[in-house]
Amino acid sequence: MASEEASLRALESLMTEFFHSCTTNDRKREIEELLNSFAGQPGSWRHWLYFLSNSRNEYVMMYSLTVFENLVNKMWVGVASEDKAELRSCLPKLLLSQHALLPFFIRNKLCKVIVDIGRQDWPMFYHDFFSNTLQLVQSPSLASLGLVLLKMTSEELVCPREDLSVARKDELKKLLLDQIPTVLNLLTRILETVWDKHSVTVTTPPPSPTSRESGVMLGDSTPMVLDAESGALCLLALECLAHLFSWIPLSSSITPSLLASIFHFARFGCQQPIKTKPLPTSNGDSAPGSLPANGGGHCRTGQIVGHAERARLGVMAMNCINELMCKNCVPVDFEEFLLRMFQQTFYLLQRLTNTHSHTNTHTIKSRLQDLDESYVEKFTDFLRLFVSVHLRRIESNAQFPLVEFLALLFKYTFNQPSHEGYLACLDIWSVFLDYLTTKIRSRLADRDSVINRYKDALVLLLREVLNRIQFRLNQSQLEELDDETLDDDQQTEWQRYLRQSLEVVARVMELLPSQTFSVLFPVLQEDLDVYLGLQQFIVRSGTSRRLNITAEADCRKLHCALRDLSSLLQAVGRLAEFFTGDVFTARFNDALAIVQRLVEVSCYGSQISLYDVEMAVPSVLKPDLIDVHAQSLAALQAYSHWLAQFCGEVQRQQDQTQFVDLITSSMAAASPLINGKVPEKLLLSACHLLVSMATTVRPVFLVSLPAVQNIFNLITENHNHRLPQEAHVLVCRALSNMLLLPWPSLPEGEQQWPNRSANHARLISSLTQQYRLLPRPPNHHHTSKAVIQQTLCVLRDLVDSISGEATKSRQICYHSLQESVQVSLALFPLFIQQPEVTDEMLSFFLTLFQALRVQMGVAFTEQIIQTFLSMFTREQLAVGILQEGSSGSKVVQKFLKILQVVVQEPGQTFKPLLPSILSLCLDQVYPIVAERSCPDVRAEMFELLFQILHQNWRFFFKSSVLSSVQRSGAEELMENQAQFTAAMQAFGQSFLQPDIHIFKQNLSYLEVLNTKHKLYHRKLFRNAMLFHFINVLLQVLLHKSHDLLQEDITLALYNMAAVDFSAFYSSFLPEFLNGCQGLDPHQRTTLARNFTPERDLPSFSQGVYRIVNDLRFYRLCNGSLPPGTLKL
């Protein structure tokens, strides 16, 4: 005994030293090795049990429990049966005797070890494990401890974190399911007992959802005073229920009384904070109570639960409800159960949105503000689950008043205290509107009756959403939203808020077009009048102009009006899609009114150029004015598809005046803004409008308009006042498309191709003049680089924009570009050492190959490829690839992309290049990337290999799939076998690498090759590679290195095994198991026997899961056996 006490003191000293801030890492390693050595000795668990029982040092207790945890989870098979029995007896006794004294995290760790033993031994060797837990739950003084054990049992036995055999996992789940009725009954009893004990008045059932006043009366039945011990107990019970509900199926065990109990506690979250006099504690103090987390802490009798702790009970109760709501698979006989849940929730929603509370001092918003934030989030989650998962089940039930529910949801939504809460509720409305739209499309016959049922609610929703985006009504709240920092979607907080709001407006528009238009247009008109009236306040003074609005109140009003006009213009643009297609004629007048107004506003902005006017508070008003002008152009651009349809209609009519006026005025609005001195936001909006007119609308007369001619002159003649690059590219694209794209509704003979071709050639000649005149050899001056990069950027964009167009457009484009392409090819070798320039050149050539390779012709294409192949030597490739993320690496990627395009060309055109491309791929690129981390280049190289195999299968296999099947096993005609084998080896090697993206990509490539070309059935693959691939994929599953791809890997395994199931089960499987280290013959036989020779995918997948899981389990068991153990 004395030696054990001495050991304990020494251990405590060591543990204290280990965690001391002054202890060096080297010393910590020494201590760790010393402890691990001692813990690993056979029978050392007795010492650790003594340490655990007799020490109050938390470090010692935690380490002791870690030793036991490791013993149970990793070495249990090798522990002697009498030692196991002693541990099963000692540890629970220790827990019962000391649980009240232990810190809660130590107590929980001890509970976890006991549950781990139960997971291994219950019921065969530890038959009273679960019954002991249930007895604790039923004991008034030990119920909390029992609930901690019960929750851990649910967590650890249903979803075991350590390896168990599949049979054991199934057994445990079945054993627990058998106990669920008893468990739920006990938990119901706990909740009911506490509720009944603390209820102030007699509780009545939930009201009918249609009763508006009963919800108020029921508020009195919620216990406002709850002692801390009861609160902690209920919190643990609800935590247990939440976890149980996450995995048990819906069944009759979830009784109405259990549901009612949960909803009783959900009411706690609805309570307002109140001032109550705390009950005196045993020592005479008064203190607010708190519920211990995770069942921790100890509650003194008489301590009461405060508002925050009551809210935690409400949150946990909502957690339970949401776990039930998540279950999409609802048996038919559970419709009544669901209805009961929704009636209870309806009641809670009434309480949350009730303005007649007993204090009569709270607005709904302030009530929600006072509630626990987590409770409101959980309640919103519930509403989302109800609408998205169960609305279709409950809508037609006469006992559930959906319209009244929507009225309450409306109040709940528009009284949210936070922007995030409001947006979460808007998401619920979006789901509801999608549901309604789908329902109407499937029931067109009674469309009107469905819409009329919800019409008033939707119009109300529309008005309120529009109100919420207006600064004149909500300036202080909207100013809180950040409009500068971009999120992962490249949106600011304000932009996200506005976008989500406008999506709701658009969904209402789809259902109620005329009502939406009549609500939106007057609001827009009001702000437009303010904007259009600004001209009268402009005062001229010599050459300068000033906006004569200076009073602070007037500036604030103007700021709000301009922000709102900007938002409403975006709303008008978002609705453009609802005026085209089949409804074009029916809604023509409304759309025409909108477009005319947008043209008027755009012209007005361009004529008086308010961005150029001096004003008070320019830092606020100038961005507002620029934004309104930009948004008017963007909204007009959104109607380009409507204008295109209008263009098609007027082609068939004599009178085109209206259409011509709209286009002429639009261009008059855009043209003055295409100037380097204009603010960039405005400039880009004008450029995008020009592109849409040229690309989408395509009026015949567009190019002849004076405003457009001015733009041509600016771009082709005025090289000294160049636009910013992005704007320059957009304008060049628009001008090019005006000349290249066919005019709609006109026959080929009236397209004026010769004239347009000549004009396009002149345009390109002007754009590329400096580029074509670059000196050779180049002077490598930075201006030369700038000319190359800027010119090729423009040309690449022009080619890309017509890549999907008709042959004539592409022919004209290539004819104009021909000289520039020749220049680019001549310059390429001269800049091979400058990756920034080479990257731009290869980007240009890649776009050319993708869009114009037919027009370029075979000979010239082959010349380009041969030039590239000769330039990219092994050394050049190595330099580029090894600088990961650099321009050099990008150059290699672009080169491989170009080769991908080439090898995908059908026919025999580029087949002579295949040997060179394969050699580059396998002999030059692959050796460099095989052992290095260069994922981008590696991904492109495997994509190229795949395309070579996929698009040029007969380069390797002369026979077709059909003839090879008909030959039924005869000799296959194969060529280039060495390259094919090398390619397959490269794919196989990639499955041994940690890169999960390459693994997924390459696995899908093999699957495509098998689907299209029967890769796995080919004789060479079947005989020499198939089992190697299966072995590698199984080993990957065993090592859990790519668990995210488990389903993909299993599907590939199935397709490979399906080549010859008989050989897989009779030959491969025994061979695979014989090669697996760490198994005995009996285990190998068991594994093979349990993998039943099924041939359907679900059964095969289950077999793969089982063999992988059980193999890992056996290895774990065998690794834990003491040396020299006789394995039977």
Swiss-Prot record:
Disulfide bonds: none annotated. Transmembrane segments: none annotated. Its main location: nucleus. Residues 31-97 form the Importin N-terminal domain. InterPro entries: ARM-like, ARM-type_fold, Exportin-1/Importin-b-like, Importin-beta_N, XPO6. GO terms for molecular function: nuclear export signal receptor activity; small GTPase binding. It comes from the Eukaryota. PROSITE patterns: IMPORTIN_B_NT. Keywords: Cytoplasm, Nucleus, Protein transport, Transport. GO terms for biological process: protein export from nucleus. Belongs to the exportin family. PANTHER family: EXPORTIN-6. Mediates the nuclear export of actin and profilin-actin complexes in somatic cells. This is Exportin-6. The gene is xpo6.
